[in-house]
Amino acid sequence: PYGTKSPASIARYACQAAALLQRRDIKLLVVACNTASAVALDALREQMRPLPVIGVVEPGAAAAVDARPAGRHLVLATEATVRLGAYREAILGLDAGATVDELACEMLVALAEVEQRRGSVAETFAGVIGGDGAVAVSASILID
């Protein structure tokens, strides 16, 4: 788990993993980790050039805005993702009328990592926080 690591460590780990994949002659890299996308996407794009590198923050933010235009969104994510404000920036970049709150929630990350991020986990967090709808995005849940 990257969430409590320093940005330098996260970028180093992500770039090392990408280098291993690059040796396998991949055609595209999807960075399917919110924290790695928030911290290391630019470094990965530079390292993997000319291959396309796609992160999950921008598509996740777009899904949240599509689900709740001008809505209030709560981002539950790793400490690093929250500290960087990646979702806040991406959501507000798409919808200046949105409200974005962020909360570091390492327990949710642990649940997601054991593939319990659907159904009851998302519903439990929505109920605890008082949300009436949730869009699950990797290890983050955006709730309005």
Model segments located where?
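Non-catalytic structural scaffold of enzyme domains
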Residues: 1-144
